[in-house]
Amino acid sequence: MAIVKCKPTSPGRRHVVKVVNPELHKGKPHAPLLEKLSKSGGRNNNGRITTRHIGGGHKQHYRLVDFKRNKDGVAAVVERLEYDPNRSANIALVLYKDGERRYILAPKGLKAGDQIQSGVDAAIKVGNALPMRNIPVGSTVHNVEMKPGKGGQIARSAGAYVQIVARDGSYVTLRLRSGEMRKVPVDCRATLGEVGNAEHMLRVLGKAGAARWRGIRPTVRGTAMNPVDHPHGGGEGKNFGKHPVTPWGVQTKGKKTRSNKRTDKFIVRRRSKK
């Protein structure tokens, strides 16, 4: 993995910082594991914008990544590592002994030729997936399920990991990167190790056009708008003279947005109380 700073041959190249991984496959992805991916432009089925700052960008195919890791007792070998335009992490194409191929998230340290396995009998080794009742306390894991059999939901982005800090009865306690402590059923699966490509955070796009290639549209400040468009808009000068709010008048910068009281009992400690 190399960090490359581009030379200032033009204004658009001056600030670009690239993350180059020579181990990534340079050819086409595995076609049977691709699906069409349509652009939403941030609109819902009514055509109304539900997520701002989304639109345009390069076409992509969706890679069918195996988040469940439920092919138990069959060893697999890593054929190659690949770039995935739909996520910050890299993915690995694995070939099982019965001939099936699947994509998985590529953990840190995994390389072509390595062997991996899933199931209760899998060894405690990076890349192996097994229920958390079989993983030692103190281990670092990623792609963690919140419900048994649902597939991994926690710690899937580049460099992400979770630590198992306790096991009590039918639950394990996890420490998330945010500092939050959370309980999850012991039969939920997790993959050992942390997600690779942690250097993703060091990249610098360098110009607005690079964000547009990724489907990210400009973010306009409310104070730069007119009063008809935003509560911060209008007035003389830059001060908007009130507590910051969203375009719809809801308080921002610190307001709690979580509303799922049913699962509050599984949160042992909030992230704000590190």
Curated annotation (Swiss-Prot):
Lineage: Bacteria, Pseudomonadati, Pseudomonadota, Gammaproteobacteria, Enterobacterales
Descriptive protein name: Large ribosomal subunit protein uL2
Gene Ontology CC annotation, any one: large ribosomal subunit
Keyword match rRNA-binding: yes
Pfam families xref list: Ribosomal_L2, Ribosomal_L2_C
Function: One of the primary rRNA binding proteins. Required for association of the 30S and 50S subunits to form the 70S ribosome, for tRNA binding and peptide bond formation. It has been suggested to have peptidyltransferase activity; this is somewhat controversial. Makes several contacts with the 16S rRNA in the 70S ribosome.
Region (Disordered): 221-274
Family label: Belongs to the universal ribosomal protein uL2 family.
GO MF annotation terms: rRNA binding; structural constituent of ribosome; transferase activity
Keywords annotated in UniProt: Ribonucleoprotein, Ribosomal protein, RNA-binding, rRNA-binding
Thylakoid recorded as keyword: no
Assembly and interaction partners: Part of the 50S ribosomal subunit. Forms a bridge to the 30S subunit in the 70S ribosome.
Gene3D superfamilies: 2.30.30.30, Nucleic acid-binding proteins, Ribosomal protein L2, domain 3
Alphabetical list of InterPro entries matching this protein: NA-bd_OB-fold, Rib_uL2_dom2, Ribosomal_uL2, Ribosomal_uL2_bac/org-type, Ribosomal_uL2_C, Ribosomal_uL2_CS, Ribosomal_uL2_dom3, Ribosomal_uL2_RNA-bd_dom
GO terms under biological process: cytoplasmic translation
